[in-house]
């Protein structure tokens, strides 16, 4: 990812206001600033609404795992020395349907590393949430706009990124 684009994404994330705070616990006693974690505000909910509970049937369920590609404990020393620890989302691409509630589980499989999840489009950051170690964090997403949305872990860039493609509604 280009540095200017990444800086713009972080600036949008910092500028987001009026969003709900995501409740999060620190990693192994580490104190976290949970004000950096939020769900879509009223304006963003016109594009994607997110709920921590299912208020009815979901159309699909998706599992996205954190994946350690090269880490200090088991990765090739040359790779870790040159690039640092490298992580990825698996799968890195998900397709969903417009206006169809989709339950997405985020499984952080690392016992000693926090990750986060940021959902954004070129014009706006919609949400950011913490993915604590060894936890399943689940939300119901309903996208109200077709198109391509980007996802990333801001803690592990540039490798930990992906996309969600919102397709037209399913035929009835």
Regions found by a protein language model. Give the residues of each.
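Juxtadomain low-complexity/linker regions and immediately adjacent membrane-anchoring helices
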Residues: 43-47, 51
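Histidine- and aromatic-enriched segments that form or immediately flank copper-ligand environments
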Residues: 81-82, 105-135, 139, 161-163
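C-terminal motif of bacterial Sec signal peptides marking the signal peptidase cleavage site
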Residues: 16-18
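Sec-dependent N-terminal signal peptides
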Residues: 5-13
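N-terminal edge beta-strand
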Residues: 60-101
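Solvent-exposed coil/turn segments that connect beta secondary-structure elements
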Residues: 101, 107-111, 122-124, 144-146, ...
């Amino acid at each position: 990812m280009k540095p200017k684009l990444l800086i713009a994404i972080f600036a949008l994330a910092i500028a987001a206001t009026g969003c709900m705070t995501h409740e999060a616990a620190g990693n192994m006693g580490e104190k976290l600033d949970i004000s950096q974690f939020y769900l879509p505000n009223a304006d963003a909910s016109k594009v994607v609404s997110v709920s921590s509970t299912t208020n009815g049937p979901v159309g699909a369920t998706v599992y996205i795992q954190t994946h350690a590609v090269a880490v200090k404990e088991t990765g090739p020393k040359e790779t870790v020395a040159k690039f640092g620890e490298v992580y990825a989302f698996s799968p890195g691409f998900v397709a969903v349907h417009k206006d169809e509630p989709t339950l997405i589980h985020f499984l952080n499989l690392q016992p000693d590393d926090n990750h986060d999840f940021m959902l954004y489009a070129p014009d706006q950051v919609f949400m950011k949430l913490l993915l604590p170690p060894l936890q399943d964090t689940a939300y119901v997403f309903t996208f109200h706009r077709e198109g391509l949305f980007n996802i990333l872990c801001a803690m592990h860039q540039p490798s930990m990124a992906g996309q969600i493609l919102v397709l037209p509604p399913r035929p009835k």
